[in-house]
Amino acid sequence: NGHEVGAFEATGHKILPVAVGGDGKITPDMLNPVVEQHRDPHLTKPGLVYISNATENGTVYTKAELTALYQRCQELGLLLFVDGARLGAALTSDANDLTLPEFAHLCDAFYIGGTKNGTMFGEALVINRPELTDGFFRMKKRMGAVMEKGWIQGVMFQALFTDDLYFQMARHANEMAARLQDGLKAKGWTLWVESPTNQVFATVPNDVKPQIDAVCDYEDWCPYDESHTVIRFVTCFQTSQEDVDGLLAALPDLH
């Protein structure tokens, strides 16, 4: 919610944060306390669990993890929505053991990310429960999410799902991230998390950051401690081996 300037809550829905570990995943046991804490009728009643695959920390839900989470959601009367902005990266990761059809049956709704894997704009929402589609178009229209030339988005996804292009591009991004991670470790950098997808997180000394600023752009992810910061690099389908190797050559050695 922090990166979306309160967009979810602006629609009238309340976000109930769940504290997760370093892998960025929500587990079944994390849900029960939230539900129990909100049984008071004066508090917001939980209705849906929102997760991302790949997660914000670049990790991937396994088939067993997603199955267990979905089962718990059903037991608690909660819907499960999966943010698939990086779904291509997740499903082509070496850490993944799910096919797209298997994944699709382990949640109530999800979207197939396009913006982060080749399209100029847009995502493709998949709703698995027919009762959730009632009035959905009107809802989109009311929120200003119906495009005049929406067919253009369909054309882009048609191209992405021809000849496995969507997954080829995501797989390439993952491979370039792995190359970058290996190169950073060889230069003495410390990884904050071993990400199997196209996000790379490194913990760097704050006094070294000016040297990094001089050679590339990156994102400050979070403070690590008083003298270190976690920074993020992201690769994509356009990232080449030459791009990665050139960046590694320019970055400081931290041995």
Where are the model-predicted features located?
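PLP-dependent aminotransferase-like
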Residues: 1-45
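Conserved C-terminal alpha-helix-loop-beta "cap" of PLP-dependent enzymes
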Residues: 178-253
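Active-site phosphate-binding strand-loop segment of PLP-dependent enzymes
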Residues: 26-84
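Active-site-proximal loop/turn and secondary-structure-junction residues that shape catalytic pockets
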Residues: 55, 86-88, 116, 239
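Active-site C-terminal subdomain of aminotransferase-like
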Residues: 46-55, 60, 97-197
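Hydrophobic beta-strand scaffold residues
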Residues: 15, 80-82, 191
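Active-site pre-lysine segment of PLP-dependent enzymes
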Residues: 63-71, 75, 86-109
